[in-house]
Amino acid sequence: MHLRRLMRMERSVPEKYEGLWRRRIIIRRDGTSDSTTDVWWFQSPSYSIDLRVPVSSTAGQKTAFAGVTIQSTSAEGEILEWRPDIAFPGISDEVDAGYVTLNTPDELHERGLDGSYDEDWYKVENGEMTSSRSVDGDLFNFVIEGSIWKAVAKGRPTDSYFGHEEDQSKWTEVSVYRKSEDTTEWRLVASTIELSFLH
């Protein structure tokens, strides 16, 4: 029998980075850029949920993760590092970290530690957000919810899209919802999982 544990974590990220961020553009060192991919970065005091959905993407082209966020400082500036507990299409061995600068309270610039990319982000109104992270055996569950937007992530560290393209039970779910303007119901906006599998 597995016990479901609600994880109470100390703050690891300054309050100024909390909230829902949307990416405006990424510019890569090779000169290519992307301003059309839908990206949602939900940041709580200690962990984050991130979903990226390219325009007209297939399932395997989406990327997402949920896990702990760590802030540190170097001579180059403040650093945020994202350490996924679960991810889609799978957990990578690569370090995910960047130098971050707030140009205004609602405008953030991120630069890769190796200079391989620059990203511009803007904060989206989402009211006061609540968050939870729990573990049931090897199953992680994350929820970050505001007054307008909500993100849910569920999966295992061993989940992988590759080799299981037709078996969504082996995929980590990361879903973004928006509250309908005329009701209190949450409407699914985007997910790593197909809608038919979620219901």
Predicted regions and their residues:
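Lipid interaction determinants
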Residues: 2-64, 74-199
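Catalytic phosphate/metal-binding cores of nucleic-acid and nucleotide-processing enzymes, i.e., regions
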Residues: 68
